[in-house]
Amino acid sequence: SDNSTSIICSIAEDKPANEKSAHSYNILMLHVANALADFIIGHYEEKLISRIINTNYCYFNSVERKEILSIAIRIIKNEDKNFLNSLFQIRRRNIIIRKLLEYFESSNSLILDGFVNFRLKDYIKDLEEIVEKAVDEFLMEREYREFIRLLKYFVEIQDPKVEVIHVVVGFESKYILLDENRKEITKDCIQEFIDEISEGEINYDDLLVSSLITMAPRKIVLHSSGLFRNKELLETIKNVFPGRV
């Protein structure tokens, strides 16, 4: 049909005449399979991912599905240079090559649309797992955005208790808070969380964010930001206090 992609491979003899020509034939088919694998990845992968999203996750709206698609493509292209993703990239390509070589053992022509849809079940299953991962990442990002929006609201509805808070990383990643006169105010800031602190293990990152929200300073100065072990914490503070950090 007009929507199908046909690629026909013709070999002069049905079977190689001798061992040398058999070796040449195998090399030829390997080159053909490699070229077709690259073509399938380049021309089908994004369409297949989009189809999986639209079929399996139709309850997301069109904007959300586009966002999930972009996350899935980022994962599949390994833009984050993740080692495991690199291995999965190689695995997916090898699945396609293996299936093509199996197919060419009994045929020298194929319609790519049919081949992709009916012969590459393992490959499509891998893509479905990537989409599932992209959906999880999307939901986590959405949850994070909603969380940040809520924290920003808490900051906006209260009057600043201090003009400036200086944040310094202390011993064992504890945070020291200073006011505009460089006087330590750490104890004052954490006073209302003292019961929670005495009850169990302390998460100093959460304690810092909670303290800053409670004090709602007009300006936050982060000293030696390179010493902050949790880089996401820095982003959270910047997002909750836009224009103040």
Regions found by a protein language model. Name each.
Residues 1-206:
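Conserved mixed alpha/beta catalytic, RNA-binding, or beta-rich assembly cores of soluble enzyme
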